């Protein structure tokens, strides 16, 4: 029996060694296993993957034919999920390739605008429902990361040639040109991804936070929770805090998160402004501009900007910016004037209609003042819609890399503004709760103070009446009669009838004040 077992093992090994050099195109190979039953040995063939060891000894031919598959990585479910992702990716990139024109008639938009619209629409579908200060659901978060990676993968293939050195085997150094991701994408895409992760982490930090909560707007509690800040935002649920307000650690945490989100918003705003400034101004926008800056700004605004002394803060304080429409109109006018002045600075044709009598130095000064106003407007009104110049640049832009940077930074800026607004809603509600608590305490303290004052006043009046009725309560002054004289004479002071005040000169008054004269001369 032992000899037969050894012969079977040697035959199995030689057979497997021969099968290693057979056709390599198949991913599965046939292996043999020795099975001993009732003292007899026989060879059983089974199909196993290449990675499985052919010399493994198993106890049953059924177990040898079944591969070990984890329930978490079942091929059926995994292939279905991958197939669904593949179909979704094909659909997205087909729309991008066709320029959102599914008819294929060539009437679609440019690739840059199609990609910009795809990123904007994705952010609207993911973050448009973020009405509460709470973490994003896991399915939406996973969808955002997956689909934004698909859209950003286009920038991996936008490259530029840079010089590099290559050393051969014999030690000779040769200078060659290699491809690298374009400079602006290489610097800004990782930064924007970091800002994206910071915003999602900020929302995750509010997981399990139970010191503030949201109620339905139509409920009785929601009607009571309305305030001046949330009256116009009918789509947002009112926020509630405890009667005494938030605890000090929670309040500090909210202020810390607000500062972090503010930094994210400023960084995204800076990247967006830089990308927009590098985009070319379309000719259609230039053709729609008036001849000079005065016609664009109006006489009053132009006079304020071109004065010798100019303060941008005071300039904005004098204007009516009560509505969003008025602020946007002011921004459009100032941007148009900046474009006009820049074109006049760079134009060489002095006889054209762009020429004017204003010197180049003054025009540069006016341009700097107008750009300062634009920066202040962007800081004071971060949620302001895009201006006419920005919309025109995005619409006619042909650079795919700039389109991705502009849209990605814009949606991150918008998301940061949304998160900061939700934090400010909670802090405003907390401030109202604190004011109500302090007002209630002052009211209760005022009632106690009034009761104490009335009691003390009553005791003093009773004491005076007791002194009047008690003859033994008189003092020595009462017996001497000094109180009567002082009370009679205290009403009107006695005056000497014929005494006239001495008139002093200015020098004498000065000497009296400074004490230069002797005490004898002063009288």
From Swiss-Prot:
Source domain of life is Eukaryota
Q: Where is the composition biased (Basic and acidic residues)?
A: 465-475
Q: How does it assemble?
A: Homodimer. The homodimer interacts with ARAC5/ROP4. Interacts with ARAC11/ROP1 and ARAC10/ROP11. Interacts with PRK6.
Q: Where is this protein localized, as stated in its record?
A: Cell membrane
Q: Which gene encodes it?
A: ROPGEF8
Q: What is the effect of changing residue 175 to A?
A: Decreases GEF activity 25-fold
Which of UniProt's keywords are assigned here? Cell membrane, Guanine-nucleotide releasing factor, Membrane
User: Consequence of mutating residue 234 to S?
Assistant: Decreases GEF activity 14-fold
- Report the residue ranges that make up the PRONE domain in this protein: 76-440
What's this protein's name? Rho guanine nucleotide exchange factor 8
Function per UniProt: Guanine-nucleotide exchange factor (GEF) that acts as an activator of Rop (Rho of plants) GTPases by promoting the exchange of GDP for GTP. Active as homodimer.
Give positions of region: Disordered. Answer: 44-83, 442-523
Of the GO CC terms on this record, one is:
plasma membrane
* Single annotated GO MF: identical protein binding
Its domain description in UniProt is: The PRONE (plant-specific Rop nucleotide exchanger) domain is responsible for the GEF activity.
According to its UniProt record, where is this protein mainly located? membrane
Recite the lineage of the species. Eukaryota, Viridiplantae, Streptophyta, Embryophyta, Tracheophyta
Q: Does the keyword Iron apply?
A: no
Q: Which InterPro entries does the UniProt entry name for this protein? A: PRONE_dom, RopGEF
Tissue/organ expression: Expressed in pollen grains and pollen tubes.
UniProt keyword Membrane present: yes
Q: Where is the composition biased (Polar residues)?
A: 44-57
